[in-house]
Amino acid sequence: MTAVQNKSMSLTPRVCPLCGSSRVSSVLIDEDIRMSELTGLSFASRKAPEGMHYKMAICELCDVAYANPAPDIRWLHDQYVNADFDTVSESRDAAQNHGRLIRSLLGRLPDVDRALDIGAGDGAFLDVLRRIGFRQVEGVEPSEGPLRAASDENQKAIQKGFFSEMDFAVGKYSLVTCFQTVEHVEDVRGLTRRVLRLLKPGGLFLIVCHNFRALTARLLKQRSPIFDIEHLQLFSSASLHYLLDDVGYEHIAIAPFSNHYPLGYWFKLVPMPTRLQDLGQRLLCVTKLSQLYVSLRAGNLYGYGFSRS
């Protein structure tokens, strides 16, 4: 396991990343960061919960929960570039979940000429897009770990680095996707605005993200896995709609998202002492329940909007 890069982190005050307001309705959660416990998996996708997070405030105007203060963006970039990756099977499961959502929306796309996935990981979702019928698929991913795990075809299709519209063709994409990534981006409004410029008329931007107002998050409170050192903001239905509407998307829809994962993965997300977690995982393996697939609405949202036709 890789050691976290440069454990020296500074925090600076921040206004709302969606609307720019400094008006706060409440503090959602207080800071809990233990720098000595950071590892190479701390900034990896679909990891076991660590229980570390920034102080998060809820914006009074747009209802997004955001880290304030937040870490230096250069420090964050270093963590993502050097993050470990050990979730190939879970990456494929996530891609299948997202593929089902895309198939339900295919009839509303202008065509299946070109698609871009922001935060592409090892490219598992690019494989799904090809099977759906997209003629040209591209991705962008900053972390070296998942890129090393990608197939040769996907390594060629994925731009290494952080998303910049300068690297992609303006007005050419029928579909841009961003799955469990908007929580990690410092300037999420800027990203959403730049994606709009990449879409062809009638093109679709699809987001899947955590919902801090979901029942699971409200019940588990600070023990919920959505409160994580990777997350600079968390959304609700209201704030995700605000993000898309304020930037200029049309025909916006927001809804809960169901995930289909093995029981072993779901159990990994349950907050409990390590010894109990290990015992539970062993029991699931012995009883052959670990790979039993279960669909749950565990507290995610999907939201989409179209560019003007």
Where are these regions (language model features)?
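A C-terminal cap/extension of S-adenosyl-L-methionine-dependent methyltransferases
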Residues: 2-14, 32-52, 253-309
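Conserved SAM-binding loop
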Residues: 8, 12-13, 24, 100-219, ...
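Short, well-structured beta-strand/strand-turn elements
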Residues: 136, 250-254
